[in-house]
Amino acid sequence: MLKVSKYVTGVVQTNVYFCYDDETRACVIIDPAANAPHIIRIIEEELHLKPEAILLTHGHFDHIMAAKDVAQHFGIKIFACADEAETLADPKRNLSGNFGVEVTLQPGEYETFRDGDTLHHLGREWKVLETPGHTPGSCCFYIADGLSFQPEGATEPKIYSVLFSGDTLFKESFGRTDFVGGSQEAIVKSIVEKLLVLPADTSVFPGHEAQSSIGNEQKYNPAVFLGRVNL
């Protein structure tokens, strides 16, 4: 059974996710934002996990600051969208320069994937959905058979799909598009055409703030109205 644990850290309160197999303790880390020593301590001492990969939803500094240190500590690889290379490599584009630091990931320091690729972790298929708009190479990760939950009175558990949406889709909102490389038109198109077409009971784990579901976003996300669609 897969489980998801969240740790909030950094100057803009970024959600770091640990998606793991409850039996094997194998783990995928999504967006190790900051405070590498504490992330490592949570993994080793609190959750007792065995990381096998780091996945990045996009290249802004508040989602990648701890990536290299965590990857080196556990001897694992970092994966990011190929179209996010410029953001990852440039402190101005990834916004770290705005805070007086230079955080970068250069080509060769991470592996790449593209839209439509399927990653294999924790015995599941993770579909890459490239969702430009917040940044040119923003992406989300979709697991069709993600979480198992047995409602009260049910004889069998129900399987829920999972979406790690980064800063593309938030609860009843979406990511900022006023940074370098951002586009409101692109993010609305990404959300409407790639995310809101997923099953309504899909659990959405965003890069900031509270969890949601696709069904909730189909009703209340402003992208629905900005995209002039009727879902």
PLM features: residue spans?
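Conserved beta-strand hairpin/beta-sheet module of binuclear metal-dependent hydrolase folds
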Residues: 1-47, 140-150, 156-157, 161-164
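Hydrophobic residues at beta-strand termini and immediately following loops
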Residues: 7, 113, 131
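Conserved S/T- and glycine-rich ATP-binding loop of Class I adenylate-forming
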Residues: 19, 57, 131
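Metallo-beta-lactamase
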Residues: 25, 94-95, 125-231
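Active-site HxH/HxHxD metal-binding segment of metal-dependent hydrolases
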Residues: 27, 34-125, 146-150, 219-227
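Hydrophobic residues in well-ordered beta-strands that form the structural core
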Residues: 30, 78-80, 165, 206
